[in-house]
């Protein structure tokens, strides 16, 4: 029932059934009540850490949010130039948590559900002193040493879609504008996702379509098929849509299309037929620029 939940790592426990009550499991195998499990696997917890770390995270979050759902979006005085150049922004296309940090005032990004569904980034940034909710696809996670910690295939997963849907609904309830950075090639193809992706994608599509706050979408990479439609496209109500010059927008990824059209062909034929889609000569924003 809470909007955001934090959990202390050492002593915090959260469960419906105790780990030992789950058939075939005991706490030594998998502690389903731990902060790690609840943040990484279930997504019930937004942040974990020591008591001091949690209090610091809560302070950062509260500073981003309006006092209530009737107050205008949270503003504060800003000395960071809104039009400053982010020289390395294009290099952060894969890990959009870094990209959002770069564009935010004073490089402050308050990420929620950081450990869950890492292929989707959600959190709050400040732009010219105004709080903005940000949702972004992510294909790689880099650690502080600039090493790849996790890698994804650029598709939209069921967990990622639900994570984003819940966040967009919160932003809409509190009159917080939404920014999306889109780089998605399709839906995740796995047995786990196939059980849920249709419903999860519908939830995200509805969340964007139903939201009455300002919605801006920036296509920073691929934007293919129904997955792109789901990610705050013009078709579901985005107020403004922009695209980077190297963005690719189309009905389907060429390689995926080749697999469908040449289902009985060998791998070499599919590889040849699955050539990259031609990029448009002109990229138009929603206002025709």
Segment roles from a protein language model:
Residues 1-289:
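Ligand-binding clefts of soluble mixed alpha/beta catalytic domains
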């Amino acid at each position: 029932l809470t909007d955001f939940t934090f959990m202390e790592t050492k002593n915090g426990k959260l469960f419906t059934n105790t780990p030992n009550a789950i058939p075939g499991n005991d706490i030594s195998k998998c502690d389903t009540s731990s902060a790690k499990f609840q943040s990484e696997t279930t997504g019930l917890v937004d942040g974990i850490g020591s008591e001091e770390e949690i209090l610091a995270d809560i302070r950062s979050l509260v500073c981003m949010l309006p006092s209530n759902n009737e107050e205008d979006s949270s503003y504060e005085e800003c000395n960071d130039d809104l039009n400053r150049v982010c020289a390395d922004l294009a290099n952060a296309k894969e890990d959009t948590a870094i990209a959002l940090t770069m564009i935010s005032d004073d490089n402050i990004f308050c990420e929620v559900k950081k450990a869950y569904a890492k292929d989707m980034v959600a959190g709050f940034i400040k732009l010219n002193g105004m709080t903005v909710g940000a949702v972004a696809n992510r294909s790689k996670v880099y650690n502080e040493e600039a090493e790849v910690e996790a890698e994804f295939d650029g598709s939209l997963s069921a967990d990622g879609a639900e994570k984003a849907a819940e966040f967009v609904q919160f932003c809409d309830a509190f009159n917080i504008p939404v920014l999306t950075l889109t780089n998605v090639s399709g839906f995740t193809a796995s047995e786990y996702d196939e059980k849920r992706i249709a419903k999860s994608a519908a939830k995200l599509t509805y969340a964007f379509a139903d939201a009455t706050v300002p919605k801006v979408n920036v296509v920073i990479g691929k934007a293919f098929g129904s997955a792109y439609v789901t990610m705050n496209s013009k078709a579901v109500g985005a107020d403004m849509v922009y695209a980077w010059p190297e963005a690719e927008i189309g009905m389907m990824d060429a390689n995926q299309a080749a697999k469908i059209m040449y289902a009985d062909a060998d791998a070499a034929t599919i590889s040849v037929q699955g050539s990259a889609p031609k990029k448009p000569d002109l990229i138009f924003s929603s206002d025709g620029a």
